[in-house]
Amino acid sequence: MGLLDYQTIKQDFPLLQTKMNGRSLVFLDSAASSQKPRRVIDTFANYYRCRNANIHRGAYRLSYEATDLYDQTREKIARFLKARSPVECVFTRNTTESINIVARSWGEANIQAGDEIVISELEHHSNLVPWMMLAERKGAVLKH
């Protein structure tokens, strides 16, 4: 695979066509909220217009269709990530929620008093705080 042309990729992201103070927008807060390519925006808009229904619990056609789309998406993601099973892929709202789930589940089960939790000094606040709180609860040491 050759180098990616960032200008071509940038064209797929509508918000990145915005000018701020007369200059092209550069968005560097993707840990908090990543920008979406046009294809994702269009796919979600179509889903909400035509397919939005409860998944895995409705007993009507639209719910069955939404469930099928959800399950197919999970299977595609599992293949892309080379997961052993689609059930290994968990959907969350965002990175913040995901890292909190990891810290509150894996961290609670595995971190013990005196253990060292090592993170980068460059971490986003949403990745720093869950580990700080876990270290405090467990008597572990947070290093960065």
Residue ranges of each PLM-predicted region?
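Pyridoxal 5′-phosphate
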Residues: 1-144
